[in-house]
Amino acid sequence: MTTTTDLVSYEDALASYDPVMGLEVHVELGTKTKMFCGCSTALGADPNTQTCPVCLGMPGALPAVNATGVESAIKIGLALNCEIAEWCRFARKNYFYPDMPKNFQTSQYDEPIAFDGYLDVQLEDGETFRVQIERAHMEEDTGKSLHVGGATGRIHGASHSLLDYNRAGIPLIEIVTKPIEGAGERAPEVARAYVRELRELIRALGVSEARMEMGQMRCDVNLSLRPHGREKFGTRSETKNVNSLRSVERAARFEIQRHAAVLNDGGTIIQETRHFHEDTGSTTSGRVKEEAEDYRYFPEPDLVPVAPSRQWVEEIRSGLPELPLVRRNRLREEWGISGNDMQSILNAGALDPIVATIDAGADAASARKWWMGELARSANESGKALDELAITPVQVARVAELVTKGELNDKLARQVILGVLAGEGTPDEVVDKRGLKVVSDEGALTTAVDEAIAGNPGVADKIRGGKVAAAGALVGAVMKATRGQADAARVKELILEKLGVAEG
């Protein structure tokens, strides 16, 4: 077994080999009922309370296809630029494992609902990489195993296992890429970018929340290496059920290094499934990988073929929303920002909050400033996502409005935001409770300016001598005297007027 200490460096691996990837992503569709029966798909129910003879595989139970599941699959296929089959059918994928009570999984084999598509993804530097899609097919999820005892939570070393069949039969769409070649050293980044873009697309379509941490979206990372200049693919490994964007990238990177180490030592790569470990960033062997013939696929005799009419497909196409990449490019042009700026917004999870704040009346620059500034810092400090903060886009827009009206300056606005986050009420309530209003009384400002000049005669002389930049010290003195509640720009104007100096 190759350990992390046996790995060759990533650079050395890429010096000798080209990585070839294949990504299989399973997405749980957000239907109200399961794929082939009427059982609820709601989360949080007691174990084995959302089952029936169909999803438990009882003799004589007959399935029926969930039409919403089919429609969701077509939406995904169209959004991935796939061809939609005029006729497709389900098949039985036969294997024995405790979490599959029927001893077969109802899936699609040689006749998927969608095929031959692509998805363009943007990398960190703004470069676009096209990932070709082999197919997208419908199937059902398995039950859930809970392995009790042992140190890893896996079946090996466990004293016993518990089974919950509530998940068995939940609709899935599996999206399979064609071999991803030509990414070179950026292959792990491409894998991460692809899964991220696919997740955003799924969410935009409204067919799933695609929350990886909850198992609603899972990625299998297939990887092989081949020596430079060789066309034939190497033997692949499949790292199963990777459940975060970061882990997808780390799993691909580790497997590149592991494969290279084995090949450099004259070893042979075994076609197998592997498990990814978050704590170490490494993978370990699972089981020898089956080929399609090992599953003895055959057409599902209890279900008729699915034949979506062209009219229905076009109706679905006409109702598709603006897709994420198109939307981002449009917003980037409207806002006049760079690709790197947009990528930073995406990485922070700030795009939707910013758009919602603009929709609530704020200008784009102000919305970006607050979400990417004070609110991003608060999210990082609290370990929360931006959309988990106790402030709404409407409230952020109100803060921006108060600044625009001159009732708050940036310093006071930050205090208002912190007050809202602390649960002190709406922005207006925080302003009233804390007494956070810009000092707009000219008499009060003039008095504060006179006192600052009188208390700093040396600075005043420098300003009179033409060093306008020195006015910052007097502005600071006034801001301190007014507890930050003065309009700094107006204070500077008054200082220069008092000293008879024109702005540079």
From Swiss-Prot:
<comment type="function">
    <text>Allows the formation of correctly charged Asn-tRNA(Asn) or Gln-tRNA(Gln) through the transamidation of misacylated Asp-tRNA(Asn) or Glu-tRNA(Gln) in organisms which lack either or both of asparaginyl-tRNA or glutaminyl-tRNA synthetases. The reaction takes place in the presence of glutamine and ATP through an activated phospho-Asp-tRNA(Asn) or phospho-Glu-tRNA(Gln).</text>
</comment>
<dbReference type="Pfam" id="PF02637">
    <property type="entry name" value="GatB_Yqey"/>
</dbReference>
<comment type="similarity">
    <text>Belongs to the GatB/GatE family. GatB subfamily.</text>
</comment>
<comment type="subunit">
    <text>Heterotrimer of A, B and C subunits.</text>
</comment>
<dbReference type="InterPro" id="IPR014746">
    <property type="entry name" value="Gln_synth/guanido_kin_cat_dom"/>
</dbReference>
<dbReference type="InterPro" id="IPR023168">
    <property type="entry name" value="GatB_Yqey_C_2"/>
</dbReference>
<protein>
    <recommendedName>
        <fullName>Aspartyl/glutamyl-tRNA(Asn/Gln) amidotransferase subunit B</fullName>
        <ecNumber>6.3.5.-</ecNumber>
    </recommendedName>
</protein>
<dbReference type="GO" id="GO:0050566">
    <property type="term" value="F:asparaginyl-tRNA synthase (glutamine-hydrolyzing) activity"/>
</dbReference>
<dbReference type="InterPro" id="IPR006075">
    <property type="entry name" value="Asn/Gln-tRNA_Trfase_suB/E_cat"/>
</dbReference>
<dbReference type="GO" id="GO:0006412">
    <property type="term" value="P:translation"/>
</dbReference>
<dbReference type="GO" id="GO:0050567">
    <property type="term" value="F:glutaminyl-tRNA synthase (glutamine-hydrolyzing) activity"/>
</dbReference>
<keyword id="KW-0067">ATP-binding</keyword>
<dbReference type="InterPro" id="IPR003789">
    <property type="entry name" value="Asn/Gln_tRNA_amidoTrase-B-like"/>
</dbReference>
<dbReference type="GO" id="GO:0005524">
    <property type="term" value="F:ATP binding"/>
</dbReference>
<dbReference type="Pfam" id="PF02934">
    <property type="entry name" value="GatB_N"/>
</dbReference>
<keyword id="KW-0648">Protein biosynthesis</keyword>
<dbReference type="InterPro" id="IPR018027">
    <property type="entry name" value="Asn/Gln_amidotransferase"/>
</dbReference>
<dbReference type="InterPro" id="IPR017959">
    <property type="entry name" value="Asn/Gln-tRNA_amidoTrfase_suB/E"/>
</dbReference>
<dbReference type="InterPro" id="IPR017958">
    <property type="entry name" value="Gln-tRNA_amidoTrfase_suB_CS"/>
</dbReference>
<dbReference type="InterPro" id="IPR004413">
    <property type="entry name" value="GatB"/>
</dbReference>
<dbReference type="GO" id="GO:0070681">
    <property type="term" value="P:glutaminyl-tRNAGln biosynthesis via transamidation"/>
</dbReference>
<keyword id="KW-0436">Ligase</keyword>
<keyword id="KW-0547">Nucleotide-binding</keyword>
